[in-house]
């Protein structure tokens, strides 16, 4: 990353009161903390695999300024993004499911509004994971370099015809596809002054909207330790579905099943942009994602 250029660009937009520091470096993005008189701003330099994020975030902020972080500046060509401080991640409070009762309908309303902008997002590089494209992408999960045991890959291979049927069923329900975050968990939803904001749109895609909750529900299981079948999941599902209309519970269940595979396919896309050394660490989390998909073959 061009640190000198980034420093100058940041100072064109805000007035730091101290040194700009690296918050974290990842293969897909570098984040810098910019101290300001009133708090902090956050600079993000996105890798090519997530180069669409600055424009997408700016577009969302222009339409939903109360639901995403304030965009202080963005540079599409260099894939740079400067955000205002959004408060505190809800994970700081232990990922309470009560907060998701509020966050999920707000997020669903954003998704519904973005249906009108789907083709524009695709034209500007947001990954295309529309359900009709997934069966052709499914074969990528069977590659020999995927970090699974042979018998696990065999299970995925045997499930391929059924997966195509499930995708066809989901498409037939005709729920409009739109932007979906694909990393919607407690570290990416922030709270401040009674507002909830969704951050970090770099894993987003255009897909079935309901698949977003694959990640949300996974973290409620793993972090909040809600057992599968806990009544909270039905309450949160219903809260999310309310802006979409009535009678969608079966469609939601189908989308969650298909979504487990879509999420794995999205992870594979990220993996393909990593070095061999970076893949070794990445694969520890990827195995979990893959095995949650394999569980849907039963």
Feature roles, as predicted:
Residues 1-18:
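Juxta-kinase regulatory segment immediately upstream of eukaryotic protein kinase catalytic domains
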Residues 16-20, 149-153, 245-253:
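Short, surface-exposed acidic
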Residues 21-36, 42-43, 71, 164-213:
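Active-site acidic catalytic loop and adjacent metal/ATP-binding pocket
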Residues 23-24, 28-127:
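ATP-binding pocket architecture of kinase catalytic cores
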Residues 64, 111-118, 145, 220, ...:
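A general structural signal marking secondary-structure boundaries and capping sites
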Residues 94-155, 175-177, 205-206, 254, ...:
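A cross-family kinase active-site recognition segment
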Residues 196, 209-245, 257-276:
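Active-site activation/catalytic loop segments of kinase-like enzymes and analogous catalytic loops
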Residues 263-298:
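Helical subdomain adjoining the active site within ATP-dependent kinase catalytic cores
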